[in-house]
């Protein structure tokens, strides 16, 4: 059973959504286990669009893992049984997050996407989002 069921009101980027509780409160949710390219990076728009396709305006299941320094909930996000983090990693539109413990499944999804040159892995040397932002992972 999920910790929360919320309605997605906005997809900010590939790994961040805004969702609304039944009482009208909104929550910024960072997708656990991945780091998607920033919208200003190659494949950032593709990651955002895929996130919209998977969770846009859906009621999603939120399994809270943590909160970050910005006050966002760090959570597994699923819509209709589809895990957003795993889907982005499998399509080659996210790295597994180095700063948080990540499931072995997400690491495997990234490894397979790299091996099969999917998404951002078609680039010779893609810049991870944490380097693009100038932060450590």
Predicted region positions:
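Small beta-barrel nucleic-acid-binding modules, primarily SNase/OB-fold domains
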Residues: 1-137
């Amino acid at each position: 059973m999920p910790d929360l069921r919320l309605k997605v009101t906005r997809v900010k980027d590939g790994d961040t959504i805004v969702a609304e509780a039944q009482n009208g409160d909104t929550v910024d949710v960072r997708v656990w286990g991945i780091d998607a390219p920033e919208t200003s990076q190659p494949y950032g728009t593709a990651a955002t669009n895929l996130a919209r396709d998977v969770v846009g305006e859906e009621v999603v299941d939120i399994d809270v893992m943590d909160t970050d320094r910005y006050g966002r909930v760090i959570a597994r996000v699923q819509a209709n049984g589809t895990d957003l983090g795993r889907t982005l990693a499998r399509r080659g539109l996210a790295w597994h997050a180095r700063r948080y413990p990540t499931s072995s499944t997400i690491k495997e999804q990234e490894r397979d996407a790299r091996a099969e040159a999917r998404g951002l892995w078609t680039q010779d040397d893609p810049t991870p989002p944490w380097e693009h932002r100038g932060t450590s992972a």
